Amino acid sequence: MELEFLGTGAGQPSKQRNVTSIALRLLDERNEVWLFDVGEATQHQLLKSNTRSRKVTKIFITHMHGDHIFGLPGFLTSRNFQGSELIDGGKPTDVTIYGPAGLQQYVFSVLRAAQVRLQYRINFIQVRPGIIFEDQQFAVSAFPMNHGIEDYAYRVVEKDTVGQLQVEKLLKLGLKSGPLFGKIKAGEIVKLENGLTINGKDFLGPDRPGRIIAIVLDTKDTPEIIKAAEQADVLVHEATYGAENSIMAKRHGHSTSLQAAEHARAAHAHQLILTHISARYLGKMADQLVKQAKNVFRPTYIAHDLEIFDIPAKKSERKDKIDVG
């Protein structure tokens, strides 16, 4: 699992930072990539990256401001020309797009006006607060933000992986590998031929706890941020302004780097990555954003375009239960 920052700027592109897009690379977990926002020129950024458009299966849009969506029609079109990952004997993979009201109309209007005919299907899911996607491996929840427009943060929860089957313990009971092992690994209660009844859970190692990623972009302070980021392994948080511009940040519906750190600390997050940086913060000025945050929350980093952060799998069992909602 990796986070690649395709664009880390705020409002408009600069020479140092393109506008917002984040790729959650789940190549080892499910051979997929999920995008969070698709700012203008995201497809150009992908050309500089090892992330392939054909791997993108889900796109999560936080809100309908241009610096977060103007790259979406172009990305969908270039994905069409570059070819999709083929499944089921040649059928291109579909893309599911999650976002606020008006997103589907926007995308289809642009594609229709440009006479684009996609070789794959786009499925639109209008976001509401709560769980918006869930399967046996992951759950994604949306939390309403405070930005003067319909806006969401996203919480990605990887579900715990069942512990490994302790084969040696079973062999000591005289059992041989076969279908019975499958039932035991599923945690079922099994009656053996010798009359002994065993609980499959007693023959499993500890579960491997899943990872939690929180994506909190354009917003000013709201209690929903803490809910979205609760015990996140990585909290990605906008930091458009420094603490010295807190009044301006509030006026424009944004956060400061100091506020991002306060949110990370309150949510008991493990790591904070700052993004959505205003073009006014260059060089040492950008370093000041990190310094302000580190005074409150030490494990803070600032993202740069095309930078990749690895999120390693956990080895120890998490003692507390994490709510995916």
Curated annotation (Swiss-Prot):
Cofactor descriptive note: Binds 2 Zn(2+) ions.
**Family from the record:** Belongs to the RNase Z family.
The record describes its quaternary structure and partners as: Homodimer.
Report the source organism.
Oenococcus oeni (strain ATCC BAA-331 / PSU-1)
- Reported EC number(s) for this entry are 3.1.26.11
UniProt xrefs under InterPro entries: Metallo-B-lactamas, RibonucZ/Hydroxyglut_hydro, RNase_Z/BN
Per its UniProt record, the required cofactor names are: Zn(2+)
The enzyme's first-digit EC class, named in words, is: hydrolase
Q: Which UniProt keywords apply?
A: Endonuclease, Hydrolase, Metal-binding, Nuclease, tRNA processing, Zinc
Locate the residues binding Zn(2+) 1. 63, 65, 147, 218
Q: What is the active site of this protein?
A: 67
* Annotated Pfam families: Lactamase_B
**Residues bound to Zn(2+) 2:** 67-68, 218, 276
> Which NCBIfam families does the UniProt entry name for this protein?
PRK00055.1-3, RNase_Z
Q: What is the lineage of its organism?
A: Bacteria, Bacillati, Bacillota, Bacilli, Lactobacillales
Which reaction(s) does its UniProt entry say it catalyses? Endonucleolytic cleavage of RNA, removing extra 3' nucleotides from tRNA precursor, generating 3' termini of tRNAs. A 3'-hydroxy group is left at the tRNA terminus and a 5'-phosphoryl group is left at the trailer molecule
Q: Which gene encodes it?
A: rnz
Q: What domain of life does the native source organism fall in?
A: Bacteria
Q: Which GO terms describe its molecular function?
A: 3'-tRNA processing endoribonuclease activity; zinc ion binding
CDD domains from the UniProt entry: RNaseZ_ZiPD-like_MBL-fold
What protein am I looking at?
Ribonuclease Z
Outline what the protein does: Zinc phosphodiesterase, which displays some tRNA 3'-processing endonuclease activity. Probably involved in tRNA maturation, by removing a 3'-trailer from precursor tRNA.
